[in-house]
């Protein structure tokens, strides 16, 4: 009995799987879409942060800091000092 490998003369049947360079499978497309969504969220957050840094007081309503100051001046928050 010989231990040498011999090639069969008949051709191999074509594979039923996708070709090697055909594209992305389902898991890769899902990961790609998820990463793309994360990048979009990151860009939106960066734009928002830059806009806040450039003009921080335009995003703050005037009533949130003027009313609070008036309340402190009226002495309504004396219990907070205890």
From Swiss-Prot:
Record's keyword terms, sorted: Membrane, Transmembrane, Transmembrane helix
Stretch list, region Disordered: 1-20
GO cellular component: membrane
Bilayer disposition of the protein: Single-pass membrane protein
InterPro entries listed in its UniProt record: Cortexin
PANTHER family hit by this protein: CORTEXIN-1, CORTEXIN-1-RELATED
Family membership noted in the UniProt record: Belongs to the cortexin family.
Role played: May mediate extracellular or intracellular signaling of cortical neurons during forebrain development.
Record-given protein name: Cortexin-1
Protein's organism: Mus musculus
């Amino acid at each position: 009995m010989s231990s040498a490998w011999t090639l069969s003369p008949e051709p191999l049947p074509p594979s039923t799987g996708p070709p090697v360079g055909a594209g992305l499978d389902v898991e890769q497309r899902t990961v790609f879409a998820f990463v793309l969504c994360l990048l979009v969220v990151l860009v939106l957050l960066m734009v928002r942060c830059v806009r806040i840094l450039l003009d921080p007081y335009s995003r703050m309503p005037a009533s949130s800091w003027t009313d609070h100051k008036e309340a402190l001046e009226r002495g309504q928050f004396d219990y907070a000092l205890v």
